[in-house]
Amino acid sequence: MAIITLTSDLGTKDSYLASVKGSIYSQLETTKVIDITNEISPFNIQQAAYVVRNCFKDFPHGTIHIISVDDELSLKNEHLAVKAEGHYFIGSDNGLFSLLLSEMKAERIVRLNISQTTNCMTFATKNIFVPAACHLARGGTMEIIGTEVADFEIQKTELKAVITKDMIRGAVIYVDSYGNAITNISKEVFENAKKGRNLSILFGREDEQITAISTKYKEVPPSEKLAIFGENRLLQIAINQGKANKLLGLKLHEIIRIEFK
């Protein structure tokens, strides 16, 4: 059974998401539709890319991932289907794929040329992405639904941590539903820079400070702050049984410094 995942900013309040799912099942009753999340902040491609990048490998090869964020077609916002690491990704060329493909290699990219069966041009997810996904789920080939893109250029749109001799300077790139502030500082970068030295993790306007890396959230008492590497091997600032983003004022793009002595 083919699997199609949905990641979108459609929300669950309106009928849009139900229309997308109904369209999938109308075209291919035997598929399985799984929501990754439909609560992406409106037009936030960074958030969508982060979420998909962190979980797509948990799905079997051949899974088709529809990513519906800023999906309206324009000259600067074309629609693509990408095969990478054995998975298919369908979405808009609005910077999303530069973020997705920054750490993986695309096997094939096509520019979708599916003809709509409706005059409505504002719901590409339903009218273009869904037919493309169902075609692939049936075992169809990519050249049937699009023209080959041979010169796709990855735009460096994602912030990278800056490493110096005695410091790593990173930033918050995502805040999860628990209020954990996830940074762009990887465990590999951290371990290469630490070299057995003591550390201070500094953030916030009053230079909040953490001096150790925890391995579990409950290593500190409730309501205490901590730093921990999550399953995705990225450093996060958290509060045991609390919301770090609110209590520590950590927002997207907030600077996080790790100083070594």
Located regions from the model:
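N-terminal glycine-/serine-/threonine-rich phosphate-binding loop
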Residues: 1-76
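A conserved acidic, glycine/proline-rich C-terminal tail/linker
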Residues: 182-249
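General beta-strand structural signal in soluble alpha/beta enzymes
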Residues: 6, 33-36, 67, 89-92, ...
